[in-house]
Regions:
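Subtilisin-like serine protease catalytic core
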Residues: 8-110, 131-136, 184-187, 197-199, ...
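Catalytic-core segments of hydrolase enzymes
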Residues: 21-24, 29, 74, 127-235
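Short pre-catalytic strand/loop immediately N-terminal to key active-site residues, enriched for Gly-Thr
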Residues: 57-66, 236-247
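Structured segments of extracytoplasmic/periplasmic soluble domains
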Residues: 77-81, 114-121, 160-163
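Catalytic-core regions of hydrolytic enzymes
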Residues: 104-125
Length: 247
């Protein structure tokens, strides 16, 4: 996957001594950190928040139960340093914002308020909990239909983008012509998914709002190597794009 998104070439240009990048991952939470498999990851759990339960415990409960673990996978793709898995963030620090569960995603707008420093149900903010650290990027893997460019969510994401936050979102899983939000918001980078042969994954939403495509998943053996291309699965495409911010 690193070769597909030209990570080696990018490192030749910018060098590996990049500035730390603070990335908010709005998903199902972070892994249970005492697990030694994630000792090399940089998850700033003390900076994050569980928007659904409205508490500071943004752990990925589903991961701990050996079940759904989308947030753990995405966060590790961004920040994993070693132990058999290398992420592409190069010192990226992940702030888990828990908004997603097995049955879907919930209080995403509250998460935008939290990250933007606005009043929200948590009574705190990213700036307060991080000690005034800058937020560089946001990663969102959820979406839905029926949005608009003038919605409160798009406006709030626009405010964050105007502050210099690079915002990436999965384009969605609806196929050709399907439009998902917030990926279609004016100042959000929409990222489609490619399969093992660098073609569009069959499920990936394709529309005029898609800005990039990256490895994202396919449940078939497109390259005829006898192994399902499931290694790319779950449409984690945006996590390969947004960590390229090195400022």
């Amino acid at each position: 996957n690193f070769d597909v998104v030209n990570i080696p070439e990018a490192l030749d240009i910018i060098g590996q001594e990049t500035k730390p990048v603070n990335v908010a991952v709005l998903d199902s939470g972070s892994p249970y950190l005492p697990d030694p498999a994630f000792g090399g990851s940089i998850f700033d759990t003390e900076w994050g928040w569980d928007m659904e339960d409205n508490d500071a415990l943004a752990d990925d409960i589903e991961f701990e139960q050996g079940s759904f673990s989308h947030g753990t996978h995405v966060g590790s793709t961004i920040s994993m340093l070693n132990d058999g898995v290398d992420g592409n963030g190069m010192s990226a620090r992940v702030t888990p914002i828990r908004v997603c569960y097995q049955n879907g995603c919930g209080p995403t707008y509250s998460a935008y308020l939290y990250l933007n420093g606005d009043n929200n149900d948590s009574g705190t903010s990213f700036a307060q909990r991080s000690g005034g650290q800058p937020l560089h990027s946001m990663n969102m893997s959820y979406g839905g239909s029926g949005g608009s460019a003038t919605s409160a969510s798009c406006v709030k994401l626009g405010e964050l983008a105007d502050k210099g936050v690079l915002i990436a979102s999965s384009s969605g899983n609806g196929g050709v012509g399907s439009i998902g939000w917030p990926s279609a918001c004016p100042k959000v980078y929409a990222v489609g998914a490619t399969n093992g042969t660098d073609r569009r994954s069959s499920y990936s939403s394709t529309n005029e709002y898609v800005d990039f495509s990256a490895p994202g998943g396919e449940y078939s053996d497109w390259n005829s190597d006898g192994v399902d291309d499931l290694v790319y699965a779950y449409a984690y495409v945006d996590s390969y794009v947004q960590t390229s911010n090195n400022g």
